[in-house]
């Protein structure tokens, strides 16, 4: 199978005309197309992270599309690391698509071996939502990033980020949420990225306000925003290590410092002095030299962040393994930095609250507006989703198929989904709605450097939980179920359930979504978190062990 270099203009189909034999298959096909439409490098099927792919290659993509268009409503497509390998007669209640992406056994899952397996066309880096067709653009993590910044304000800055400066790096498909999230939280946010294309994309989609022409220009702009106590964002093109050092020399003292660069040297971390294209070429021709140069740059990058910390900034990693890689590069103090999960997100996970999302298969923004209305008439005024929806309407542009992210907890996701299914059935919503989520959720991931870092009981690396999550999703009839690994660093599960207005969809939605959040609550209760134990008791989840017969 040959890589295709001529770009295709892949766009998700809109409207209510079917190309497949049912709305379940059609919606999944549109989600795949939507991934490509929103991808950072669609000509290579790369969606984000400079490497996370939607399919192994274009031949595999075409075979997936062809199968989705012709398969029956009682068949299941099986995909192995972006390659369709089988179509099986199952039953109407079974998932239509099962995917296992990037899973490599234990000691063979390190960076170098994974990179070699990718080069040989045997696996892919799946990301969390790229290879299972659940990506909705940078919006996918904007609320979680916003929530982290707001929580930082509450914990460290008296409840407000007005007049505060956030410094960060990385403006790709994931990191691109940071400047908008910081602006929404009221901060003056400065984001550095070595790739001008990434910053231009964020500018064009409303996630970034302006791109500075130099470090001095960026400093002047960000200081003006902070002095005026206005939320806003500034981008600057440059290597994070170089720019962070320059900003420190010029006496910028940010209040919050974090980072969402792709720090994997094989897949996108750019050494100082090289362009992204030059770095990619060096990885191909001399990977050992690329690794050495990247490690030297990353060490400078981490030391700059530590200097900001020593000057009083709140500094934390945003889940990109910067700390572990910096420690390996000779900066042991980087391991002292906390994670955004342990600082801000874990209390939400204990209540089953996480990044739920819904996508309008019709492509009609009116369908999302209808769901906004359902939310506003269903959830109490003080609920975080009620606070979020007006902000999302104001600030977030749709990318590809109209979609929303909204953090909801146990029982709340199914409550919304059932009301939406009714609206599809009676025509208030014009076509099916796909409900899915990030893999960053309570019960769907084992990631000792991120979601499950420093678990109370030491169960950081126990990966039974995402496996159980995926098996539950299959048992309950999710339309699509995926199991992913990020090399030797994490394992995760994803699922999509489709509201097509039918009674069967209603049954599936209730079962799938309640089990998804329920296993998350149980996971944290099992680890000893009191809030999770209270939530488990409130909802009658779990099994009591001990205490007699």
UniProtKB/Swiss-Prot annotation:
The keyword Aminoacyl-tRNA synthetase does not apply. Binds 1 NAD(+) per subunit. GO terms for molecular function: nucleotide binding; urocanate hydratase activity. InterPro entries: Urocanase-like, Urocanase_C, Urocanase_central_sf, Urocanase_CS, Urocanase_N, Urocanase_Rossmann-like, Urocanase_sf. The keyword NAD applies. Its EC number is 4.2.1.-. It catalyses: S-methyl-(E)-thiourocanate + H2O = S-methyl-thiohydantoin-5-propanoate. Its cofactor is NAD(+). Changing residue 450 to A: Loss of activity. Hydratase involved in the catabolism of S-methyl ergothioneine. Catalyzes the 1,4-addition of H(2)O to S-methyl thiourocanate, leading to the formation of S-methyl-thiohydantoin-5-propanoate, the second step in S-methyl ergothioneine degradation. Cannot use urocanate or thiourocanate as substrate. PANTHER family: UROCANATE HYDRATASE. This is S-methyl thiourocanate hydratase. It comes from Variovorax sp. (strain JCM 16519 / RA8).
């Amino acid at each position: 199978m040959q890589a295709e270099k001529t770009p295709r203009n892949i766009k998700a189909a809109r409207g209510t005309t079917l190309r497949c034999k049912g709305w379940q298959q059609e919606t999944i096909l549109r989600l795949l197309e939507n991934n490509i439409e929103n991808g950072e490098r669609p000509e290579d099927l790369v969606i984000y992270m400079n490497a996370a792919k939607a399919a192994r290659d274009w031949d595999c993509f075409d075979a997936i599309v062809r199968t989705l268009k012709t398969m029956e409503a009682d068949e299941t497509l099986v995909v192995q690391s972006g390659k369709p390998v089988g179509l099986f007669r199952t039953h109407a209640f079974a998932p239509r698509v099962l995917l296992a992406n990037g899973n490599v056994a234990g000691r063979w899952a390190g960076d170098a071996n994974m990179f070699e397996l990718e080069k040989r066309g045997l696996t892919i880096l799946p990301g969390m939502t790229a290879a299972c067709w659940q990506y909705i653009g940078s919006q996918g993590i904007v609320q979680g990033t916003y929530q982290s910044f707001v929580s930082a304000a509450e914990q460290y800055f008296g409840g407000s980020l007005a007049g505060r400066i956030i410094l960060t790096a990385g403006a790709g498909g994931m990191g691109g949420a940071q400047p908008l999230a910081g602006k929404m939280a009221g901060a003056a946010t400065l984001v550095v990225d070595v790739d001008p294309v990434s910053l231009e994309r964020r500018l064009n989609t409303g996630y970034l306000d302006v791109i500075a022409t130099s470090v001095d220009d960026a400093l002047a702009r960000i200081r003006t925003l902070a002095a005026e106590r206005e939320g806003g964002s500034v981008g600057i093109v440059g290597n994070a290590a170089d720019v962070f050092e320059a900003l420190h020399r010029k006496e910028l003292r940010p209040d919050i410092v974090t980072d969402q660069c792709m720090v994997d040297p094989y897949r996108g971390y750019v050494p100082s002095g090289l362009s992204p294209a030059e770095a990619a070429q060096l990885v191909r021709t001399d990977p050992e030299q690329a690794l050495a140069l990247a490690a030297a740059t990353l060490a400078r990058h981490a030391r700059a962040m530590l200097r900001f910390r020593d000057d009083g900034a709140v500094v934390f990693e945003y889940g990109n393994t910067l700390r572990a890689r910096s420690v390996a590069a000779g900066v042991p103090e980087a391991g002292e930095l906390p994670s955004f999960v342990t600082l801000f997100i874990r209390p939400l996970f204990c209540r089953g609250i996480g990044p739920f999302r819904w996508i309008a298969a019709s492509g009609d923004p009116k369908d999302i507006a209808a769901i906004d209305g359902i939310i506003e008439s269903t959830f109490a005024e003080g609920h975080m989703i009620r606070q979020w929806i007006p902000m999302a309407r104001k600030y977030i542009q749709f990318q590809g198929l109209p979609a929303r992210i909204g953090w909801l907890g146990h029982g709340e996701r199914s409550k919304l989904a059932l009301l939406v299914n009714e609206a599809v059935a009676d025509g208030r919503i014009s076509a099916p709605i796909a409900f899915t989520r990030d893999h960053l959720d309570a019960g769907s991931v084992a990631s000792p450097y991120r979601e499950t870092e420093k678990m109370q009981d030491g169960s950081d690396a126990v990966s039974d939980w995402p496996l159980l999550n995926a098996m539950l999703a299959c048992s309950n009839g999710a339309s699509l179920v995926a199991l992913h690994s990020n090399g030797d660093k994490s394992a995760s599960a994803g699922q999509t359930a489709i509201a097509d207005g039918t009674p069967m969809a209603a049954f599936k939605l209730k079962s799938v979504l309640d089990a998804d959040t329920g296993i998350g609550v149980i996971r944290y209760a099992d680890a000893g978190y009191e809030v999770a134990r209270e939530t488990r008791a409130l909802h009658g989840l779990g099994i009591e062990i001990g205490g007699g017969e």
